[in-house]
Amino acid sequence: MHPDLSPHLHTEECNLIISLLKKCHKEHNVLKFFGHCNDIDREMRKCLKKEFEENRRRNREKRQRIINAHKASEK
């Protein structure tokens, strides 16, 4: 199962791959069960993972800045 694939949650790159996957599923509604769209699906999952890791890194940096600012204000 994929996470929410709403366009406002993802980068343009991932949105393009998501739309290609949806198009593939629509055009090949039977072949999709036999792996016809698997390559696009793998690319989408790789893009979503990269996005997730980037968000995680950004949040970690933000948290560290907040902690450092809090420690500096205590001194």
UniProtKB/Swiss-Prot annotation:
Q: Which InterPro entries match?
A: Cyt_c_biogenesis_Cmc1-like
Q: Which PROSITE patterns match?
A: CHCH (PS51808)
Q: Which UniProt keywords apply?
A: Disulfide bond, Mitochondrion
Please give the chief subcellular localization of this protein.
Answer: mitochondrion
Say yes or no: keyword Disulfide bond present.
yes
* Name of one Pfam family that matches: Cmc1
Subcellular location field: Mitochondrion
Motif Cx9C motif 2 is found at 37-47
Provide the disulphide bond pattern: 14-47, 24-37
Q: Where is this motif: Cx9C motif 1?
A: 14-24
Question: Start and end of every CHCH domain?
Answer: 11-55
Under the cellular component aspect of Gene Ontology, which terms does the record hold? Answer: cytosol; mitochondrion
Tell me its family. Belongs to the CMC family.
Provide the function of this protein. Answer: May be involved in cytochrome c oxidase biogenesis.
> By what name is this protein known?
COX assembly mitochondrial protein 2 homolog
- Give the organism the record lists: Taeniopygia guttata (Zebra finch)
